[in-house]
């Protein structure tokens, strides 16, 4: 039995509530069990200078954790002078994941900034951020179309993310913090609604895992992402 008492293939309770930030063009409060992340999408009329004249837009992301999102208070990274390596890695992952399913020329030479702020962390903050950020971005595109800023929907597909791992020899889906800490293997999968793989991050914490075990985790992740995509569809109507 896994520490959370869930079945091996069972997600935590996931909710996606859009329209939670009054001023943002798009927003979503996402929960994966006790993990809670506020995702917002902000439209900037000017894109990056290096894309000027290309006719393409850009999507970038920033990620942060509130100081007391964890068991003990963490120092705000702004006071350290720069984001940690972990934060930079997650920011880039969120941006890459969203750009993989967006027609960037359809945005025009504009930039959309995704902010993912972790209110409470219990494992899977990066996977929750990607899943919720897609909803916030979808709402931003809807806002842009309603004001004739863009004429077509730039969104080409859904994208969501989920963690998988091997705990006491058993493959499990959507690890919370206790499970992640005790897992022999853990991995994050970013997958599109049509089944395309955007990114895989996997680590053997104890002993190397086999190709067969990896493929088992991939199958588990695809089943989890299919459920998350269904929830995204419900959230955006």
Curated annotation (Swiss-Prot):
GO terms for biological process: rRNA catabolic process; rRNA processing; tRNA processing. Pfam families: RNase_PH (PF01138), RNase_PH_C (PF03725). CDD domains: RNase_PH_bact (cd11362). Its EC number is 2.7.7.56. Disulfide bonds: none annotated. Keywords: Nucleotidyltransferase, RNA-binding, rRNA processing, Transferase, tRNA processing, tRNA-binding. It catalyses: tRNA(n+1) + phosphate = tRNA(n) + a ribonucleoside 5'-diphosphate. One of its GO terms (molecular function) is 3'-5'-RNA exonuclease activity. Phosphate binds at residues 86, 124-126. Homohexameric ring arranged as a trimer of dimers. Belongs to the RNase PH family. Phosphorolytic 3'-5' exoribonuclease that plays an important role in tRNA 3'-end maturation. Removes nucleotide residues following the 3'-CCA terminus of tRNAs; can also add nucleotides to the ends of RNA molecules by using nucleoside diphosphates as substrates, but this may not be physiologically important. Probably plays a role in initiation of 16S rRNA degradation (leading to ribosome degradation) during starvation. HAMAP family: RNase_PH. This is Ribonuclease PH.
